[in-house]
Amino acid sequence: MREAAERRQQLELEHEQALAVLNAKQQEIELLQKAQVEAKKEHEGAVQLLEAKVRELEEKCRTQSEQFNLLSRELEKFRQQAGKIDLLSSNPLTSSDISGSPSKSLSQLMNGIATSLGKGHESPSGSRCVISEFIRPLQISGDKPEQLSVKPTFLSKSRSDTPRCRFDSDMDNDQNSNTSKQRYSGKVHLCIARYSYNPFDGPNENPEAELPLTAGKYLYVYGDMDEDGFYEGELLDGQRGLVPSNFVDFVQDNETRLSSTLSSEQDQNFINHSGSTLEGDILEISPPSHIDSSVISNGAGTLDVNIDEIGEDIVPYPRKITLIKQLAKSVIVGWEPPVVPPGWGTINSYNVLVDKEVRMNIALGSRTKALIEKLNISTCTYRISIQSITNKGNSDELQCTLLVGKDVVVAPSNLKVDNITQISAELSWLPTNSNYSHVIFLNEEEFDIVKAASYKYHFFNLKPNMAYKVKVMAKPHQMPWQLPLEQREKKEAFVEFSTLPAGPPAPPQDVTVRAGSTQATIQVSWKPPALTATGTSHGANVTGYGVYAKGQRVAEVIFPTAENTLVELMRLRNLEAKEVTVRTLSAQGESVDSSVAAIPSDLLVPPSPHPRTAPKSKPLASAGAPETKEEHLGPHLKIDESWEQTHSASPVHGHTLEPPVPNFPSSLQGRRSPSPNRILPQPQGTPVPNTVAKAMAREAAQRVAESNRMERRSVFSERSNAAQYANSDDEEDGYDSPNVKRRGASVDDFLKGSELGKQPHYCHGEDYHTESSRGSDLSDIMEEDEEELYSEMQLEDGGRRRVSLTSHNALKECNKNKTTDATFLEQPDFSQQIHHSKKLFSIPEVAEEDGEYSELLYKQGLGMPYKKKSTIARDSRPPRPYNQDQQHNFWYPAKHRISGMEDFTADDKGCKYSRSLSRSPDSGLDCGSEEEESRFTFRYTCDSVSANVASSCCADTADCSCRKSMRPLLARRKTLTRQTSIEEDFGDLGSSFVEPRSEQVKSSYEKKYETQKCNRTDNLSNEDIQGGWKNDLKMADSRAAGPLAKSSHRDAEDSLLLGNPSSAGRPERVEHAGRRSSHGSAVPQRSRPMLVPSIDGYGGHDHLSPDIYEESETDPGTEDISTRIFVALFDYDPLTMSPNPDAAEEELPFKEGQIIKVYGDKDADGFYRGETCTRIGLIPCNMVSEIQADDEEMMDQLLKQGFLPLNTPVEKIERNRRSGRQHSVSTRRMVALYDYDPRESSPNVDVEAELTFCTGDIITVFGEIDEDGFYYGELNGQKGLVPSNFLEEVPDDVEVYLSDAPSRYLHDTPMRTKAKRKKSVHFTP
């Protein structure tokens, strides 16, 4: 019992002790619970404090964004001002590192303020601290962030022991980094790098102290250059170091403007601009130099927090997925919650996906772990992903994913390249683990590092049409021990791709239209497309910009960074265009049209005409030396020379505001098509085999030869009955007889050509001759080398047919004289002329003094272009004797007139012009000469020249000393003749139109007569002259089917002196035709003068052609002021071509082929008052030619049409048609295998440069095929481009005559026959 009692006491004691211990433990638990509550409160307080600090920093960020926007705009303005120099290779706004303007909002540029503190996410203890978890910058706008060149290099990479300490220290470092940085002293200069420079490739021992440079990039330099030639410099991304002075150019020395720019750039250094899009796109991928440079490292690579982690439209994704446990049939994975910016929203839950299939949904607040079962780990591979579920959508599953199962390797899979362009590509892959970062290698060179949770990469600044090999190597954040060794070692994936060939550039942006500097122009402005440092867009080398209206180029500027140009309103009104577009021009073609810019309606309204002010007198220019021309014309000479060399460009492309430097080849070989990148058309129908093509060529050649022989026999038969005169040149030049009519290009033809849009076949020698396309009506003296240059330019013209039909070519056609003793003149066929505008020829410069007089006489009578028979039949009238009373004793021997000329011209007061006429774009010289005036005014005053003076002059010069008196007339002048005095001179005669005609032609005969007998007096009888005329007439060119006098009022003068337009029946001045006669035809110099027969025996009205007689009913002295229509022979811009100061206000611009309405006669300055596009102003007479309209209806139709069609037939006879020189290019005969009408089949814009032909036509081609697949050929007297795949060469063993008879000269002018297909010249050797 005692033992039991003791035992009980002992148990009670132990029980009490246990109760005491329990109480103590309970008290301890209570204390711990209280401590936990207090700790939780303390933690919540700390969190609240941090949130307040975040809001404060966020507000500061917004403030900085506003300041940054202001500074960015100021920087952009500064760069635009600095852009006055050529920034093609130095514009930072369009360089490879910047795809957008720095004036973008801060939400796009400064969204990376929350940056990670290290390259990886993991710390040794497994904890991590990312500033972006506490600081969320503003949202970004747009689909993709901007590509920037700024890389922060100052963020702290050090790690602290605790997350809070790391956060505090890094925040302090971030806030103080830009203020603690040392500032250089001295003056700040903005520079641009001229060349790329890698210090490690340089010769210096300390390359790390130098800055790497990229050509075209901006940088700052401080102070002065040191003794070694280096500056202290800073790049825009904050890097500082030494800069070699010979590698940079100074842009601006304005320190005040640079101060704000520098501060804005330093503010950018606080921000991380690299990042990726929603898919993790890394945009900061372009290294400082081009891609194929040496191994490039961007330091720490891309930072942890990127643009993809922020933004209202980007859903925060879970982070750091981890494989906790892998079993045979299941796995356990864990992750960390996403970082949600304040105010963005809340995360509702998480989806756990297996191969994109949702296996479970875990609510927010639960453990971030999941057990995934029913997996066959040993045989299959599974992709497990974690996805955030929010009210704004789900996060990207590939940003938190990993692979488990069989054959899992470290390397990424499904590596592919998409969106390949000329200079960029997009690389994507499927990561094995979203925690892995990836290293990008390009062509076996390390290129960049892509951070974790990103699986896309954008390449920029690639080279067009180049193959690239890309390697992506996974870089695990920790060793994947769960994988076997061989699977851990597989870290790389490869893919190859090729960039696209350089293609059309991007179009300009923001096209606007506003009023130009003058009332006649508008200014079109645009924003150039983004250009790389080498001046390319989409891999195409940008050369300039073209302005288009209704598909036609109306203006062009050749400058890659041009932002505006002027467009003539006249062209827009003619096209009835109300809007314009702009295209980027490049060597690889044009871009697509830009956005349409409407032309303000008030700009399209034509201005009211300005009253004509009295012209101011201008001093006359000397004529002797070439430098005098420079002094007289100043800059206009060079401008007009450029126009001269480029005026034949196709009007489809408009005019070039900055004409390129001409480069005319010496031959046709290597000739390019008029338009770049000409497209070769494809034949329609069944292809013709080679054997059939050769058979066609042989058959066609034989058929044409037989047809020619039959037609020649028929023509000769008709000719024997109808011809009045015979000459051996008939076979060359064709036959003009009543039975063989040549169809002229009348006004009806002009209109039909425009309406039908089809180019008819014409032969040489049948075209309507109007004003010369190469000279002025006022004498502009051109030397032979200039003539040769223009002849080459005509060949370069691509066969284009001008509406202004060349009188030069008409002269060349007529100048088929042979270098024999029997010198004779090819007499024009004035029996078949109507609708011919009156023109003046300019006087040539005589190179050899010994032959001056003979050459002048020769050129006076040479090359009279004949006019064609009108399509309106008129009754012929019998000839009647010449009326002697109409002579008025006006005619004297030529020598008397010449010898008395000096006295007369010395007293002439009307020879000084007050307004300078614009030069013809082709001539390059002034458009008038005093020698013209001397001859013209003398012909009127020779009535009062006494016979004694004349005879004494001749008596003293038995050796024809009239050559000496002629030399002052041949001196080169640049002053303009007084046109009104000439008109007054002829108008005062009061006689019919026959008198000037007789004087002109007869004088040449008298000059010839004087050459044989210098002491002849003025007692020369009409009978003597008639006898001489009848004798010499036999030597005249038989091309003239009628007497020389058959012409409209003074048409013999005007067609001999083709150049100055005037109305029918209005007296006009007379001038020599010599310059045109030698222009391009290279007629040999003659020791004897050419003989111009008199027309005494044929001078009466009855002997005139009825066409001429009816045209000349109006008395020239009593003609009323009438309205006439003219056609522009050249493009004319008074702003650049006129030497007159009031040109823009008073003179009208016009384009070649434009119809102009003219009121009255030209004034004393040689200007007409005309109207174009409802605007009235002055028009230089040497730039236009009159069109003789049959009636008012025809005139109205022409005025309504506005322009003559470009397919108007024009003589385009090459310059060596009559010379002994031959083309240096080869000529071949080709037969057409298919029908071809460029207006229907050609894919090219300038269809007027191409020839129309039918199957079986024989086409003569010159030279070799050009690079676009076109020949330059001739058919039926027209030259142009012909597609090579439509032709087959005619066999050499077949003799083909393409003209009516074998000619003694190459390139003879054929006649037009009645055959359906006209014959062109033959080239049988």
UniProtKB/Swiss-Prot annotation:
Entry's Gene Ontology cellular component terms: plasma membrane; synapse
InterPro entries, alphabetized: FN3_dom, FN3_sf, Ig-like_fold, RIM-BP_SH3_2, RIM-BP_SH3_3, RIMBP1/2/3, SH3-like_dom_sf, SH3_domain
Subcellular location: Cell membrane; Synapse
Protein name: RIMS-binding protein 2
Domain SH3: 186-253, 1121-1189, 1225-1292
Biased composition (Basic and acidic residues): 158-169, 627-641, 696-716, 763-774, 996-1010
This protein's domain notes: The SH3 domains mediate binding to a proline-rich motif in RIMS1, RIMS2, CACNA1D and CACNA1B.
Domain Fibronectin type-III: 315-408, 411-493, 507-608
GO biological process: neuromuscular synaptic transmission
Record SMART domains: FN3, SH3
Pfam families per record: fn3, SH3_2, SH3_9
Keywords for this protein: Cell membrane, Membrane, Repeat, SH3 domain, Synapse
Gene3D superfamilies: Immunoglobulins (2.60.40.10), SH3 Domains (2.30.30.40)
Ranges where the record places region Disordered: 153-181, 601-778, 988-1010, 1040-1090
Main localization, broad class: membrane
Source organism (scientific name): Gallus gallus (Chicken)
Function statement: Plays a role in the synaptic transmission as bifunctional linker that interacts simultaneously with RIMS1, RIMS2, CACNA1D and CACNA1B.
Ranges of compositional bias, category Polar residues: 664-676, 717-727
Quaternary structure annotation from Swiss-Prot or TrEMBL: Interacts with RIMS1, RIMS2, CACNA1D and CACNA1B, and potentially with other Ca(2+) channel alpha-1 isoforms.
Keyword Cell membrane assigned: yes
